[in-house]
């Protein structure tokens, strides 16, 4: 039986930190679903369709990754995808409390859903999509933090 895991997030846009996490997840699970949340309340820079396309391009080299957009409750989405593992990235201790609350709620809603926390590699531990966008808005060089296709799309959005 295939072990299916979901790595959810807004991914606005997907960064090399996200790619690091999903790449390592593919080494642990047979199939990884990169689940891109619609998240309209976060007012994303990129549309859901754009974020899905950018993530598909950025993960094309990872054969066991499927990129899917969603707007459902995570536990319902996981159940519909026949996934029993939820992958979450932890950059700092500050992330842990919120992630623990989410994990407990998801476990309440779907008892068979296990949360697995991965720390990004050291070089990506301080970046976030929000930080990358903010630096780029002020003409800072964010080339190192994004896949090439995502960097081009971000620069086009900010032009």
Swiss-Prot record:
GO biological process: coenzyme A biosynthetic process
Site residues by UniProt (Transition state stabilizer): 18
Protein family membership: Belongs to the bacterial CoaD family.
Gene source species: Escherichia coli O127:H6 (strain E2348/69 / EPEC)
A Pfam family assignment: CTP_transf_like
NCBIfam families given in the database record: coaD_prev_kdtB (TIGR01510), cyt_tran_rel (TIGR00125)
Pathway(s) of this molecule: Cofactor biosynthesis; coenzyme A biosynthesis; CoA from (R)-pantothenate: step 4/5
Principal localisation: cytoplasm
Domain of life according to the entry: Bacteria
Known EC number: 2.7.7.3
Known catalytic reactions: (R)-4'-phosphopantetheine + ATP + H(+) = 3'-dephospho-CoA + diphosphate
Name this protein carries in UniProt: Phosphopantetheine adenylyltransferase
Location in or out of the cell: Cytoplasm
MF (Gene Ontology): ATP binding; pantetheine-phosphate adenylyltransferase activity
Any single GO CC term annotated in Swiss-Prot or TrEMBL for this entry: cytoplasm
């Amino acid at each position: 039986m295939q072990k299916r895991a979901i790595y959810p997030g807004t991914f606005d846009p997907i960064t090399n930190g996200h790619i690091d996490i999903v790449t390592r997840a593919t080494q642990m699970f047979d199939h990884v679903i990169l689940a891109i949340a619609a998240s309209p309340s976060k007012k994303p820079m990129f549309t859901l369709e754009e974020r899905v396309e950018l993530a598909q391009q950025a993960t094309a080299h990872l054969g066991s990754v499927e990129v899917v957009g969603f707007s459902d409750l995570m536990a319902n989405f996981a159940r519909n995808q026949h996934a029993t593992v939820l992958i979450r990235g932890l950059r700092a201790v500050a992330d842990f409390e919120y992630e623990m609350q989410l994990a407990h709620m998801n476990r309440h809603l779907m008892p068979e859903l296990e949360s697995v926390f991965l720390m990004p590699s050291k070089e990506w531990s301080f970046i976030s999509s929000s930080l990358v966008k903010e630096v780029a808005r002020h003409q800072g060089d964010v080339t190192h933090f994004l896949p090439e296709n995502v960097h081009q799309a971000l620069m086009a959005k900010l032009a």
